[in-house]
Amino acid sequence: MNGISLDQPGSGSLDRERGPVDAPRAEPRRLAVMTFAADKDYLALARMTAMHVAGLLGLPIGRVTDLRLAVDEACSLFLAGPSGPDAPLLASSRAAESATLTLRFDRLAEHLRISVSGPLPLRRPDEDDLGWTMLCALVGSPRWEVRDGVGTLTLTEPIPTGRA
């Protein structure tokens, strides 16, 4: 990956032999942002983006594949309908045609933070659900939060030392 910077223009310098040289920073570095229709037909774009970013960071192929699955599952949680008659409804109505999901990839000092945000799903993620269990197995401890009518699911993946 020598010579390629994932930073925004002007935030780092380029050394032809060592690749990007970044000034120390306290804030995360935004690697990619993708906003897409909240529709299952667009999940392939989210999966491919996750694979590409993880590959650029030098993660082993097994972790790249795990992150692809985790991003797919995280996005799918926003598309899921109620699981039964007792399912807690978080959003009484939403305009499905205009709903979008936003997928963000941020580089922290030693971690990749992936967040998916969008309109509140019809049901809160259930810790006993297969999807949530898969997320926990793939990325450890996903974090779910709701703020101002927007749900955000955050995944964190360690980055091997000496990479990107």
Regions found by a protein language model. Name each.
Residues 1-33, 77-164:
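Conserved beta-strand-loop-beta-strand hairpin that lines the nucleotide-binding pocket
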Residues 33-36, 54-57, 125:
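Short, flexible active-site loop motifs that bind/organize anionic cofactors or intermediates
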Residues 33-45:
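STAS-typified acidic loop motif
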Residues 38, 59-62, 126-130:
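Short alpha-helix boundary/capping segments
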Residues 42, 64, 123:
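Glycine-/small-residue-rich active-site loops that bind phosphorylated ligands and cofactors
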Residues 47-73:
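Conserved short strand/loop->alpha-helix "switch" segment adjacent to the catalytic nucleotide/phosphoryl-transfer site
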